[in-house]
């Protein structure tokens, strides 16, 4: 089983990594192509492109300017430890064992607007480039066109390497839209995490994102390779609901969020 999750806007490049292990991203030639194009934009143009403040636009213009594919532990950090945010709070990779990192490296991938697809221990430099960014490029009108079927092809390779064909989608719609299903040789399993609010079970963004991270951790810690065992997920009050679920869309309900 291979899992995919979204990246995060919030980054942590200050704290010391809990593991010295690292790998290099596999698709940096594509990243370099995007960086060269982004370097042609002024901070104001970057702010407009990304719909962010002048401060964030200026920060990312500087990041693009200093970006180099020569990643070291001095200028980069492992992706799984660099990303922070709701999904990564649920994942809590800072408490992984060495064996957990090994399993995650084989079974977890992070989708990325700049890097395409990252393994947990892949080094990355800080950046912000949402997959939904409408950046015209040589391959089309936006990043979905830029990545084309490449991400699907790379996922196929990762699945083939582990002799499996199950892809567990724990990413947002914005990011999973970069996975072209027609090019993917896999059974896709989707998940929904709903919380009880005003008498109805609803997807509440903050809780759902955190739950995707908790599900990722559950799979890694339990070394799950049988999709049927995903139904055993019962972290922080969530329970599988057969009535609302379908074979490839697993729904988990929770009545009370932890205090």
UniProtKB/Swiss-Prot annotation:
GO BP field: response to hydroperoxide
Signal peptide: none
Cellular component terms (Gene Ontology): cytosol
Membrane-spanning ranges: none
One Pfam family hit: H2O2_YaaD
Family note: Belongs to the UPF0246 family.
Protein name from the UniProt record: UPF0246 protein PFLU_0992
